[in-house]
Structures are given as C-alpha cells and as structure tokens.
Amino acid sequence: MNDVEYMRLALALAERGRGWTAPNPMVGAVIVKDGAVIGQGWHERYGEPHAERNALAACTADPAGATMYVTLEPCCHHGKQPPCVDAILASGIRRVVIGSADPNPLVAGKGVATLRSHGVEVTENVLREECDALNKVFLHYITTGRPFVSMKYAMTMDGKIAAFTGASKWVTGETARRHVQQQRHRFRGIMVGVGTVLADDPLLTCRMGNGRNPIRVICDTHLRTPPQAQVVTTADQIPTILATCCADPERQAVYQRAGCQVLCLNEENGHVDLRQLMERLGREQIDSILLEGGGTLNWAALECGIVQQVQAYIAPKLFGGRDAKTPVEGVGVPAPDDAFRLKNSRLERLGEDLLIESEVEYPCSQES
C-alpha cells in the first residue's frame, strides 16, 4: 500500500466519529511500520483522546521509526487533551503524513513546524480534498465562528413539500426518512420556525436507537410557541433554544421555567435577525445546524446568507395544488439571473427517492 491508500484507511476511521466529536473535527490515524499497520485510531468523542493518541495506544509493536498517517494536522496546544505532537515525538515516529491543514489559530501550521524542528519528516496534502470535505463543518466553524447550516427538505417532483391541505406525512419513503434521522444525529442543532411548531407540534429528536439528539432551535419572533408544545414540555430533557424578539420577561419566564433557553435578538425584516442568531449559536459551541424550516424561514435564511448547503430529498410523486407549500417561498428573486447558485452537487439514491446535496454559492458580499 502507498500513502494514498493508507490515508484512505485513516479517512474511513475518522468517519466513525461522525456525530460525536463536535465541535472538534473528525480525525483518523494509522501507524505503519515495515509495510504493516501496527496501530490505528480515531477521535471517538468530544473531550476524549485524539486519534493520534488512540492509534499509539493501540500499537501492536514499537512505533519508533514508523510512519503515521493522520487526516488533520496534529494539534500542538493544550485543550481538553494534551498536544498530539508531544505524543508523536515521544513515540519515536519518524515520518508523519497529513491530509488537511488545521486552520485553528492555535495550530495553523505550528503542528507541522514543531514536528519538523524535531527532525520528523512531514508530508502534507495527501488526499487533502477528501480530508477537507470530511471536515467541512469544522473548517467553516473554526474560520467563521458560526455554524455550518444545511437546509434540508423533502419534496415531490413537482416541488411540493405538502398537499394543499397541509398534509405532509409522508412525502418520501422509509429509506429516505431513516437517512434524515442520521442527519439529525450528525448535526449539532436542528432549527425550525414557529410555523412548523404550530402546524406539526414536532419533537425534533433523533429516532436512531443509538443516535444523539440535536439541540433544538425555534425561531419565534413574537413568542407564539404554545407552552404545551412538545419542544417545550421536553426541554428539561433535550436542550431547546427559543430565538425571539420579544423582550417581555414574564412571557420569557414561561419557557425558561420549562427548561428552555430564551435568546432575545434584534428584529430584521420582520423576523429574528438570523445572522445575529448564528453568532450567538456559534458562541454556544453549536458548530452545525440542520435547517428543517418551512418556505418562509428557508427564504429568510438564504436571503441573509447563512445557508452553506442544501439537501433536497425528492420523491417520485406529484401533488399538484396551487396552494400547496413549496420548500422556498418568501419574495423570491426577480429574474433567473438572480437565482441562488448551487455547485458541487452530489446525487444519492435512497430507495425510490433521490437526495441531491449541493453547496450554496453566494456573491462575496453576501457570504456568511
């Protein structure tokens, strides 16, 4: 095997941490000596040992003189865990092969520099594109301080998210719905508008057996969420944030007593200032948001530039209906040339349904 093949193994290991490491990155490490893998590991959960230390601990032979393959530049600072470069140097590893550079200002090339200054051979940028893609959430969060937002919706082939009656269970099949539950596990937060709460009274949890529930964020400009709504009555068990413009302390106290966190924010174009909300969520170490809003919230999120990705689950059905809801509503763009552009699209078949996942491309002046 060569550097690329060993790095692919490290990438596969890193993937095992998805949903558990936030706001840290997913990282995998493989240690090779005399053509054989003698140790491998990954960052399993936030606050626990990093991939490099796990790989060293799993070694079946002395790692002195070996090569370590790691998907992200090793850290060189003290956080919840000690610096990984210290463990690498102490082990006698002779060569380190790295996928992605770490843009964290506490690392940002310092890990590589430290290794080289101690005589360790370092090879960089092996499968960098794949390693960067693995941690697109982390890379966005660490460079902007704001969550990576993925707008998710399910629609028919004629672009409807519900029938004209409002009925929406179910647009897609079971396989696609299971995939959505995986996304809820993988994203740190889930966000809807008060309209969704009023219409559906959703629980907004992860229904995977061993999955992690996302932090629930409700955009509710005027605090219209019913105190008996499921997101309120379960807030003592599942972290729930109400983002509002209502500064009335008595009304806020109703939700706070139930266990909700209430964020009072500025109003922008008749709704909660979503950019300000992203800043606040970033400070709460919420690195990613699965936006499951209706057409109004989705348009507002696009219009203010907070969405990085769109996940469209498309069912081979036709609903019709002049008044049937669509995924993105609001004012809309005045002309085709003004459309929000999507790039780097990926297509996946999920049973009879399709998932199209694309990045949102904003003009430089608008990008979040």
Please name every model-derived segment.
Residues I31-E130, I215, I241, C246, ...:
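Zn2+-dependent cytidine deaminase-like catalytic core
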Residues N2-A22, Y141:
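Short, basic/aromatic recognition patches
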Residues H140, S150-M157, I161-D287, T296-W299, ...:
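Active-site ligand-binding patch in enzyme domains
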